[in-house]
C-alpha cells in the first residue's frame, strides 16, 4: 500500500488546492500542536506553500531515514508534517504523559547544549535575539491556538525517538546590534525557560515596611563604601596642603591679579598676609586658631579666592579644626576660607533662626492677648452665654450642665439662708419704706440664733472672711435688713472694742489708681486710738446694692449700740476691710484715715 498510494496521489498532485483542502480536513490542526512561534502573516503563507510542495514530493521519498522530510533550504521554516503522519501510519496524538516526557527531553537537550557551547551561544543570542517585552513574555503562557499563530515563530516538532532534532532544525532570526539587548541577553542567560524561550522573572516590588528596611540597608551599604574613599581624598588633600604651601601662594597671587579693579587696591595687603601665612603655617597647626584676627577686607578677598582651586577649599578642615564652629573668626586668610556650599548653609541657618525667633515672638504676643474664641454656638436660643440669676445673683453659663448644677445647689442654699419667715417677739429697731432692720441678741430664742448662723455662714463665704473667735460672744449684736419680699438682703455684725488703729492715707500720683478703684493693700499706724464699736462684718445682697442699705445699717448701729448715745465716726472701726468695704468706709467717714481693728499683722 505504501508503494501504490503515492502513485495514486501523484496523479492528482497538480491540484494543489484540492490536496491542501484535503489535508486540512484530515488533520485540522497540525500547526496547533507543533507550531509555537511565527513572526508575521507572510511567514504563514510561505508555510502553506512549502507544505503543499512537500506533500507532492513526499510520495517519491518514502524510504528516507527516520521517515522525516528534508527541509526546504529556500524557505525560512521547515515543514511541520511528514509522509508517515499523512498516511496515518504513525500516531501523532500525544497524551499528557508523553508531552511531559518531550518537554523534559527538550530541556535536557538545551542544558547540555548550553554547557558545551556556553560562550558562543551567549554571543549568538546577543547578536541575533532581541529582548522580548513583558507583553510577549506573557502571551506564550496562553492557549496555543491558530488565533495566536501570527505572533509566534514556527519550530519543528520534537519526537520521542529523535533527540537530535534541534541539530536538524534551521531557525532564521533577525540580527539586531544593540548594546541594551546584548546586556539583557547576558543577564537573562540563566533565566527560567517557558516553551523553550528565555523570559525574565516577574519583578516583585517590596511593599510596606520591607520597602523602608531595604532602603535603609542600601543606604548603609553606600555609606560604608563611600567612607574609605572620603578618607583617602582627605588624606591626599592634607598631603598636598603640607607639601605645597609656596604653590598656593603663587596661585593666589596670580588670581589676585585677575580680580576686578576694586581688588587691585588690596593686592599689596594680600601679598603680605599670604607670605606671613606661609611662613607661620607650621606654628599655627599647634597654636589656637582663635588667637589672631583677620581684617574684613582680607576676609572678603579670601572668599573670592576660595573658588579658584580645590586645595584651598579643603584647608579649613585640616589646618584649623577649631574654626569649624565660627569660621568668621579664624586665624589666617588661608584658614578662614569656606566653600560656597558652607557659606550658603550658614546663611540659610541664620535666616532660619531669625524666622523661628520671629514666630516665637508672634506666638507669645498672641498668647498674651485675651482670646475671644466663641466656644458655644449661638443658634438663637433664649439662654445663651453668661446669665445672672435674679434670685441668688450667681453668674453662670446656662448651656453648661456643670454650671447649672452648681447654680441649683447655690440657689437652694442661698434662698434657704436669706429666707425670713419671722417670729412673734422680733426686735425691730428701724423701719423704712422698702424694708426694716431687726436686731438679734445672743439671748434670743434658738430659731432666731439659727437664722443668724445661716446668714453668717453665707456672708463668710461671699466675703472670704477668716473665722475669728470673738472676744466677747455674749455682747455681739446682729442687725438684719429684711426686705418687703421677706428676705434678708443686708447683715451687720458688731462687737464692743476698746482700741483701734488709724489707716494711713496713700499718696495719689498720676499713675496711682483713682479713688473709685481702691487697692487691697493698706497700711495703718502703730499708735492705738480709743474706739467703742467694731464692725466685724457688713454685707449687702448683690442685687440690692446701691440702695443705701449698708449706710442705713451703720446709722442704726450708731444709734442703738449704746443706750442713750449716738456714736461718732471716730468711735467705730472696721475689721480688715475688703476693697469694696474700704471704699465704703472712706465714703461713710468722709476720710481715708478711718479706724481698723482685728487684722492680721
Curated annotation (Swiss-Prot):
Organism of derivation: Homo sapiens (Human)
GO biological process, one term: hematopoietic progenitor cell differentiation
Transport among keywords: no
Positions of the UniProt region annotated as Disordered: 222-243, 282-315
UniProt cross-references to Pfam families, sorted A to Z: Acetyltransf_13 (PF13880), zf-C2H2_3 (PF13878)
InterPro entries membership: AcTrfase_ESCO_Znf_dom (IPR028005), ESCO_Acetyltransf_dom (IPR028009)
Key word DNA repair present: no
Record's protein name: N-acetyltransferase ESCO2
Expressing tissues: Widely expressed in fetal tissues. In adult, it is expressed in thymus, placenta and small intestine.
Chief location: nucleus
UniProt-listed Enzyme Commission number(s): 2.3.1.-
Family recorded in the similarity comment: Belongs to the acetyltransferase family. ECO subfamily.
Catalytic activity reported: L-lysyl-[protein] + acetyl-CoA = N(6)-acetyl-L-lysyl-[protein] + CoA + H(+)
Record-level Gene Ontology MF annotations: acetyltransferase activity; L-lysine N-acetyltransferase activity, acting on acetyl phosphate as donor; N-acetyltransferase activity; protein-lysine-acetyltransferase activity; zinc ion binding
Biased composition, class Basic and acidic residues, residue ranges: 282-305
Compositional bias segments (type: Polar residues): 306-315
Localization, UniProt: Nucleus; Chromosome
UniProt keyword annotations, A-Z: Acyltransferase, Cell cycle, Chromosome, Disease variant, Dwarfism, Intellectual disability, Metal-binding, Nucleus, Phosphoprotein, Transferase, Zinc, Zinc-finger
Function in brief: Acetyltransferase required for the establishment of sister chromatid cohesion. Couples the processes of cohesion and DNA replication to ensure that only sister chromatids become paired together. In contrast to the structural cohesins, the deposition and establishment factors are required only during the S phase. Acetylates the cohesin component SMC3.
GO (cellular component) term, any one: site of double-strand break
ZnF segments: CCHH-type: 387-411
Phosphoserine, modified sites: 29, 75, 223, 244, 312, 512
